[in-house]
Amino acid sequence: MHAALITVTIDPGKEDEARAMLDAQVVPMVRQAAGFVAAYWLEPHDGKALSIAVFDSEENAKAGAPPAGMRPPGSPVFVESVEFHNVMANA
């Protein structure tokens, strides 16, 4: 398994809009991605948020994660960084 560790910045005052977009668009899209295993979105802190999406292979993790430097059109979220890691263990 491989995980994508994603760091985003949320525009100030747009946290509710970002949360609505996460629930309505992002979660369903990631859930349908090839090789999807699990994903977790952590509550923002000081305008930054982290997510971890786990896939069955490195190829699917890279295909299912957004590119760093991306801001979807009209979105209050900017993708700061994306890292890929082999999952060593899980519980």
Model-derived segments and spans:
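Short S/T/G/P-rich N-terminal loop/turn motif that feeds into the first structured element of a domain
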Residues: M1-L50, D56-A68, P76-A91
